[in-house]
């Protein structure tokens, strides 16, 4: 934890910090500008080790769907943040494939722990009486991210060109099928989250 915190990452452990490192600025430039900033491969590896040894409890992400033109102009002009939510699960599944994280740890850190940390009622688990928020993943589907599969209104992702070995096939929110075959069913909406106080 000391190495992680000494590098200025504090208590924020987002998916992009587990995936990208400073060499990626050469090709992606301002597209991966975020706060805290993407650090070195040593920092990324320290985060991955902290994740695998359970020093990190929660994996989170933000989704900042800035237009591509807002990400131009170099480090001083490009806005911070990137659209990450669509490909965040498959990016973390790569860590499972590489043996850095177990599938059980992934579920704990991405589902159970966030619900517990924020005291969210009836979420984060598959249990009677809980909302059926589920993702069906094909763990053995190799594919490459292309621009035409981006669902975010901003129309781009820093993941374009990346090869993944798992794919999200379906997503259910409150038991309703909301995503299948790279299409979102807009007729279903989420519900207001309730928090235990």
Which residues does each predicted region cover?
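Hydrophobic faces of well-ordered beta-strands that scaffold small-molecule active sites
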Residues: 11-14, 59-61
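His/Asp/Glu-enriched, well-ordered alpha-helical/loop segment
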Residues: 31, 52-59, 64-140
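C-terminal cap of metal-dependent C-N hydrolases
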Residues: 74, 131-194
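A conserved active-site cap/scaffold subdomain adjacent to cofactor or substrate pockets
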Residues: 25-56
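Phosphate-binding core of ATP-grasp and ATP-grasp-like enzymes
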Residues: 14-21, 119
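A short acidic, glycine-rich active-site loop
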Residues: 32-42, 79-83, 157-163
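Active-site environment of divalent metal-dependent phosphoester hydrolases
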Residues: 1, 17-19, 66-68
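Single conserved hydrophobic/aromatic residue that forms the stacking wall/gate
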Residues: 2-13
């Amino acid at each position: 934890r000391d190495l992680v915190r000494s590098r200025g990452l504090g208590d924020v452990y987002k998916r992009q910090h587990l995936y990208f490192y400073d060499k990626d600025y050469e090709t992606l430039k301002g597209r991966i500008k975020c706060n805290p900033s993407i650090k070195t491969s040593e920092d990324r590896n320290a985060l991955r080790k902290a994740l695998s040894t359970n020093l990190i409890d929660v994996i989170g992400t933000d989704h900042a769907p800035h237009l591509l033109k807002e990400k131009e102009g170099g480090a001083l002009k490009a806005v911070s943040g990137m659209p990450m939510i669509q490909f965040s699960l498959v990016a973390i599944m790569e860590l499972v494939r590489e043996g850095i994280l177990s599938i059980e740890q992934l579920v704990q850190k991405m589902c159970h722990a966030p619900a517990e940390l924020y005291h969210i009622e009836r979420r984060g688990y598959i249990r009677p009486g809980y909302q059926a928020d589920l993702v069906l993943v094909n763990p053995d589907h190799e594919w490459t991210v292309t621009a035409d599969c981006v669902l975010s209104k901003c129309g781009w992702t820093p993941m374009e060109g990346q090869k993944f070995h798992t794919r999200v096939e379906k997503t259910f929110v409150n038991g309703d099928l909301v995503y299948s075959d790279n299409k979102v069913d807009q007729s279903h909406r989420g519900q207001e989250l309730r928090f235990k106080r």
